[in-house]
């Protein structure tokens, strides 16, 4: 996910540099210098290979380091994107030296701006992170970074993500909201929703990519079974799904769209009835519900099972 997000942002910065009149909605200070930390030398090589072609020296810089450099990277950064597994959050943030790296420094009576931690860890809430920062890291309330929870998806890589950002009370400063919006609009669409909806958003927006991929694959399988070459079947299924999504994003209700294509006695209504007989609608809805519960459990939420499919 981190590679996808950085890919989108670096590509966008390059596009802005080529545009003589960037849009006025850009925040005053765009992020231009990036440090990525990964766990192994092989991962360093993989990330460098994926991202280096997107770096324009006149626009942005990128360093890829091993996770042994997490503390120094955090100390240097103004914005920290936390993209580890949920169970790793406490250990990563409580590493030796991290407290000092995250602490607001005071110089000649002037405090440096708070760091911003953006978490994309499924199931980990803002209160969870703030509790780790206070209890495990040892930061005082005065030194807590600004903590933001966001949930993008893997389509960040092609700047087609659907990102949901957790609203907080009291609201974030306008400058922070503008910066967050700018960052995540570089990789797709952005909405702000309250905390109690975030696990649902994780299911629908992040896990949903896999759900829709399965449906697309199934449609292509049907075409292949009837004689289509695999490559053409995959392309047709993907483009048809993109077209349907585009119509809905333009304001067409899915039920109306379905009805418009279903002529009396036609092939579409026949196929739709097979889908209904197979319980596709209920199965997809149930998958979203189940993934929502699992997302809440990843962060230690302890939500009850809603579908009875796990023990």
Short names for language-model regions:
Residues 5, 9, 149-158, 186-199, ...:
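Mobile beta-alpha loop/short-helix "lid" or hinge segments that flank ligand
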Residues 34, 44, 73, 89, ...:
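Small-residue helix-packing motif on alpha-helices
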Residues 50, 128-146, 162-201, 211-250, ...:
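Internal alpha-helical scaffold of NAD(P)-dependent oxidoreductase catalytic cores
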Residues 202-210, 258:
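A short glycine-threonine-serine/GTX helix/turn-capping micro-motif
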Residues 235-311:
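NAD(P)-dependent Rossmann-like dehydrogenase/reductase catalytic/cofactor-binding core
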């Amino acid at each position: 996910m981190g590679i996808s997000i950085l890919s989108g942002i670096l590509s966008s910065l390059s596009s802005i540099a080529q545009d003589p009149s960037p849009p006025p909605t850009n925040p005053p200070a765009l992020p231009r210098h990036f440090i990525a930390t990964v766990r192994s030398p092989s991962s360093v090589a993989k990330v460098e290979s994926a991202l280096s072609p997107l770096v324009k020296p006149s626009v942005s810089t990128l360093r890829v380091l091993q996770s042994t450099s997490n503390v120094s990277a955090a100390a240097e950064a103004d914005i920290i994107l936390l993209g580890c597994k949920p169970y790793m959050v406490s250990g990563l943030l409580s590493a030796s030296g991290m407290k000092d790296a995250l602490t607001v420094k005071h110089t000649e009576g002037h405090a440096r701006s708070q760091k911003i931690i953006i978490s994309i860890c499924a199931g980990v809430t803002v209160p969870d992170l703030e509790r780790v920062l206070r209890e495990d890291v040892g930061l005082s309330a005065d030194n807590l970074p600004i903590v933001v929870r966001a949930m993008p998806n893997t389509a960040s890589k092609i700047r087609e993500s659907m990102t949901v950002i957790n609203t907080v009370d009291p609201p974030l400063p306008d400058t922070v909201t503008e910066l967050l919006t700018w960052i995540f609009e570089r990789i797709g669409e952005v909405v702000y929703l309250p905390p109690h909806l975030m696990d649902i958003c994780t299911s629908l927006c992040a896990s949903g990519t896999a759900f829709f991929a399965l449906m697309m694959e199934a449609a292509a399988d049907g075409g292949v079974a009837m004689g289509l070459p695999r490559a053409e079947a995959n392309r047709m299924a993907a483009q048809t799904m993109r077209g349907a999504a585009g119509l809905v994003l333009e304001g067409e209700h899915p039920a109306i769209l379905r009805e418009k294509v279903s002529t009396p006695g036609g092939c579409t209504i026949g196929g739709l009835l097979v889908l209904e007989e197979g319980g596709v609608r209920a199965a997809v809805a149930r998958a979203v519900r189940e993934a929502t519960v699992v997302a809440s459990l990843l962060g230690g939420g302890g939500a009850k099972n809603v579908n009875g499919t796990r023990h």
